[in-house]
Amino acid sequence: MSRVHPVASAVIAVALFSLPSPLARAQKPPTMAEFLSPGYPSSLVSAKKADRLAWVVLDAGRRNVYTAAGPTFTPVRLTSFLDDNGVDTSDPSISDDGAIVIFVRGHSLNRAGWGANPSSSPDGPERAVWAVRTAGGPAWRLGEVTAPALSPDGRIVAFSRDNLIYAYAVVPGALPPDIAKGEKPLVKAAGSNGGLKWSPDGTKLAFVSERGDHGFIGIYDVRKRKVTFLAPSVDRDTSPTWSADGTRIAFIRRPGLPFGQQSQAGSAGIGNPPGVAFGAPGRGQRGAEPGAPAGAPLATMPGLYSSVFPGGYRVSFWVADVASGEAHEFWHPAPDDPVFSAVNAITWAGDGVIFGAEPGEWLRFYTVKVDGAAAAPLALTPDDGFIESQAFTSLSPDGRTLYYCNNLGDIERRHVWKVPTSGGEPVPLTRGEGIETYPVPVASGKQVAVLAADARRPQSIGLVPVSGGAPAIVYPALPKAYPIDAMVLPQVVMTRAADGLEIHNQLFLPRDIKPGERRPALVFVHGGPVRQMLVGYHYMWFYHLAYAMNEWLAAQGYVVLSVNYRSGVGYGKSFRAAPNTNARGNAEYQDVVAGAKYLQSRPDVDPGRIGIWGLSYGGLLTSQALARNSDLFVAGVDLAGVHLYGNVLDPENLAFKSSAASAVDGWKSPVLLVHGDDDRNVAFTQTTGLVQLLRARHVYNEVIVFPDDVHESLIHARWLYTFDRMEKFLDRFVRHAGR
């Protein structure tokens, strides 16, 4: 049973890089288990009306929910899931008063609706929502769920299943008995119903009812058990967002689908003849009328294949009065606008709605007043600096301040900023050597909680004054085993690819390297490819682990270069969308080669002992390196990589020529392959097929397969096993290459 578990940790009001350095820790080479000894926090949330936080911790495979309340913010473990069994814990949500936290146990479903079962439990997997009281007591299971929505008062969890809306009662009596256990629908309506948004007082639930060619915004009244639709039309309405007082809803409206984009089965009704009436969206076809000549020309006329509003624009923002259901448009972009026409989500903030758009090199956030006074969106964030997505932003409880993180002025890190949602000059809250992400304001308005890290401190929960300053760390306290004084500060080095493009890299140099020594070296290539490695611990779990791995490799004596190749993020849209990458020409591989040649040029690197490793897209580039340049790379570790683009085997096809499989005849270097066979990101067949190519050419390979596991293994023990195998493999084929 779960209990409240205080965690020994005090607020440390110091900068992240000001850390103790006990000399006793440096007596022997550290292990990866020691590097991973601190718990890894993520999914930070804050109550709106109480100074209380909640988050998820992954600690040696054990996934639990934690909380901390002001003013001391002492961390407390709320749950007791103490097995390294691969059962994920995610999606925490906290009630406005901070009394209830819900969370999901179980991995997300794949396309077949099957959850991950990495421990191969004979009971099979499930994905269920649980609840726990922050005051203490055992967590309890509510039932199976996909994406739960907790009411602000913490009484109800709503969710969609099979296109209908269901609910669980968190508090007894919150729902009628036949609905409270998720067995009978809360709302049984036509179409596909989802996008659930609770009103601020928790008495109403807004939802999107998609109906193919059109869609509605629905409102379910919990007390009256009544559904109403806001200004129903032939158009497609999405992204409902509530005003602070709960009396109005803003939403996005796009034109309904024209005949030429509709797809519907004939029902022999009037205007709907037997057979397929229209083809797939965007492929207008003749109806299935007997005798219609094959290849007959399609009709052409305005409004048949594309749809616009009067005035020529394709998207508009509307606001509705919830009581009356009446609505009106309050803003639309110019006709054929290429930037704002792509907006698909808005959030009510202050007197307007805010949204993200990418007009140039960087994603920016804008506001439009709901009263319709503004003719054009007002930019809130600058036209420089990388904001990854809306997930890296949050609003103050009153909606008057936007908090976000970006890399403005410090392109290799992230820092937190704030700006009024009515417009004004952005103000930095954090600076310096740290990496601060996912800002979440505390209800009292005095502090902002962040995920914070630096080159030596792993990801932590920190509190920053709203006036700015260094994060005060509340979790985790670093274990004695954590090898902080074995770590190095990565250096930013620039390389130039064969086509002249400059590439940012991080260089990890062993602490004990001596003048005149030539060390073995490794290139690390991240996945994605829309990722950016930083000069410190990363905010994403695998890259947090990969940073620790690169530090560990440096502690083992390797020189490590982490390459931020083109098609990654952090350096602008032109870099992210660089031409001729991926299956269109593999241009990013030039950047990997440039990294290897840079290492070869260093006087402290043995040019004949360079290896490479990476996961996912990093595995893809590892396989490219070994297939195309076994003369540069003596060995590699390829975790869940892609080796053949698409399913075309034509040797003249560009995608095939861009694949590692096309160059496999040049593959001479040994490789360690690691893959889970329930990978939902990269098909396991990519590794199966590659092994056959390598066997046919007598290329040395070692293979680790994790049955029922996913893209990034969910079981800690498997990572430790993988690292042990990697250590032995690299020692044999890189450290001792040619010896």
Language model features with spans:
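A short beta-strand motif characteristic of beta-propeller blades
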Residues: 31-35, 76-81, 138-141, 182-187, ...
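Hydrophobic beta-strand positions that form the internal "hydrophobic ladder"
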Residues: 53, 98-101, 157, 202-205, ...
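Short loop/turn segments that connect beta-strands within beta-propeller blades
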Residues: 69-73, 133-137, 170-173, 221-225, ...
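Beta-strand-rich domains and repeat architectures in extracellular enzymes and scaffolds
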Residues: 33-63
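Residue-level detector of Asp-centered blade-edge/turn motifs that repeat once per structural unit
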Residues: 48-49, 96-97, 152-153, 200-201, ...
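A flexible loop/linker signature enriched in serine peptidases of the S9 family
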Residues: 56-66, 81-88, 104-130, 141-144, ...
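Serine-hydrolase catalytic core recognition
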Residues: 258, 313-315, 343, 350-351, ...
